[in-house]
Amino acid sequence: NRDGLAQHVLIRNRGTSSMPCLLAFHTAINAPFAPESTADDCVARITIGERWEMSDRMLPTGEFQSLTAEEERLRTSGVNPYFAPMDNHYTAVPQNGRNRMELTDTRLGKTLVYDVGNSYKQWMVWNNKASRKFFCPEPQINLVNAPNVNLPADDIGLFGLAPGDIWEATSRLYLKG
C-alpha cells in the first residue's frame, strides 16, 4: 500500500528471571531498486554516528575510528552506497527525530526510506565488497557482542527484560517522491 511495508516486533519475557534483549535485522536493499536505473544513480543517507573499531574477529574493541569523508557524507548529504567496500558498525544518531536509511534514485527522483525508529541504537552497514547490486543497512538495538563489551550498558544498547516485560518497536519501508 502507499504507506509501505511495516514490521512490528514485540519481545515478551515469559520466563521467571531477567533476560537480555538483543536484536538486529539483516536488511538487504537492492540498489538500484528500479530496473531502468544503475548503481551510479544511487545516493544513500544513514543516521550513523561514530564508527566502532573492530578486532580481527570482527568484534568491537570499545574504541572508535575516525569517519572517512565519504562516511561523513553518508550521514549528512548522502553518497553512493558503493564508495568503498563496507563491513562497518556505527552508533545510531537520529536526525529530525528519526533513525533511518534513505536511498535516493537520482534518475527517477524517488527515495526508498527505511525508518527504524529510535529504539535501534546501532547500525551495521555491509555492501558485499561494493558489489553495486545491494547493500545492507542493518539496524541493531545493541552493539554486537554487547554482553561481553566492558562499556556502560546505555552506550551499547544492552538492557534486560524483567519477567513479564515487553519491548516493542515498529520499522517501515516506504517510497517517497
Residue ranges with predicted function:
Residues 9, 159-176:
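Short Pro-Gly-centered flexible turn/kink motifs
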Residues 145-154:
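Short, structured beta-strand/loop micro-motifs enriched in basic residues and often containing a Trp
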Residues 18-20, 28-117:
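Active-site/ligand-binding surface loops and adjacent short beta/alpha elements
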Residues 10-15, 127-128, 175:
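Asparagine-centered strand-capping/turn motif at beta-strand->loop junctions
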Residues 1-27:
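Acidic, contiguous internal or C-terminal segments within carbohydrate-active enzymes
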Residues 1-4, 15, 33, 105-107, ...:
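A short, structured loop/turn motif at beta-sheet edges
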Residues 7, 23, 99-101, 135, ...:
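Hydrophobic residues positioned within well-ordered beta-strands of beta-sheet architectures
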Residues 104-144:
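Glycine-rich active-site loops that engage anionic ligands at enzyme catalytic sites
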